[in-house]
């Protein structure tokens, strides 16, 4: 699985000032949205962006089915040719390891009160060019959800839940492996911090939790939980669970454990 991270940054960086190649607008494969692409590599990243444009309609549709249509009409995708470019464009901490990250959704500025975000873009790592079409679609859809939900997501939202819901939107259902039964605790942000297998498992567990909520309480229940637990001015998780799902955290965890082991 390609692991994804969403990050918001405070300072605006103009891509055009750093690179001679300016974004070229293309009409996306959906009625009311436009995709702008920036290739920072060579023919390799050009081909990657062509694949993204050709398949973007399905990603937009998946996000709209879950989140609705009231989000930005402008979609910018940047394809990087080196890990150094990826780190720069995605504003990643150079002291941390990002080799297992396929893409990042970033914004230069976010006004949650006004529900406005500027400088939003999806930045693809060099390894994205080697992905299959289905894997690339998952990556782009995952990051597109973060872009769509940006102004409805607090800076201190529980990352594991934002990532799990993004994977729910992006990934097709698949059987939960028997090994998942070994850990029935709720996911945590710490699960996503360690590079390698632990981070991959953390994303899987967050995804399974989102699937569980959708199975047990409906897709509308999952969306309500995201809004209550991750939205601006959100409650703590226990309160959000009661408000969105009508159960307490103890009952939720019990049902989650039964879902994993059932």
Give the ranges of each region predicted by the language model.
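Hydrophobic membrane-insertion alpha-helices, especially the h-region
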Residues: 1-17
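Charged, low-complexity, helix-prone segments enriched in Lys/Glu/Asp/Gln
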Residues: 4, 49, 60, 252-260
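N-terminal hydrophobic targeting segments that direct proteins to the cell envelope
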Residues: 15-30
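Juxtacatalytic substrate-recognition/specificity segment
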Residues: 26-144, 151-158, 176-177, 236-237
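Acidic/His/Gly-enriched intrinsically disordered linker/tail segments
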Residues: 114, 134-139, 147, 151-262
């Amino acid at each position: 699985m390609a692991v994804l991270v969403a990050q918001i940054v405070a300072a605006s960086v103009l891509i055009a000032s750093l690179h001679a190649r300016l974004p070229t607008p293309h009409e996306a494969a959906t009625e009311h949205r436009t995709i702008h692409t920036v290739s920072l590599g060579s023919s390799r990243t050009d081909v990657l962006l062509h694949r993204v444009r050709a398949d973007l309609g399905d990603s937009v549709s998946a996000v709209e089915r879950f989140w609705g249509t009231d989000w930005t009409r402008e979609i910018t995708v940047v394809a990087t040719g080196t890990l150094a470019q990826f780190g720069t464009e995605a504003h990643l901490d150079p002291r941390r390891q990002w080799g297992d990250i396929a893409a990042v959704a970033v914004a230069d500025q976010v006004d949650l009160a006004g529900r406005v975000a500027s400088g939003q873009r999806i930045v693809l790592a060099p390894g994205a060019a080697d992905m299959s079409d289905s894997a690339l679609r998952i990556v782009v859809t995952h990051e597109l959800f973060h872009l769509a939900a940006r102004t409805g997501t607090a800076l201190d939202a529980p990352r594991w839940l934002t990532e799990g819901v993004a994977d729910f939107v992006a990934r097709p259902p698949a059987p939960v492996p028997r090994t998942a039964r070994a850990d029935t605790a709720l996911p945590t942000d710490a699960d996503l911090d360690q590079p390698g297998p632990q981070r991959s498992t953390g994303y899987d567990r967050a995804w399974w939790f989102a699937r569980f909520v959708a199975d047990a309480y409906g897709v509308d229940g999952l969306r309500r939980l995201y809004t209550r637990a991750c939205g601006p001015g959100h409650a703590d998780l226990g309160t959000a669970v009661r408000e969105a799902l009508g159960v307490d955290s103890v009952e939720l965890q019990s049902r989650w454990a039964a879902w994993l082991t059932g």
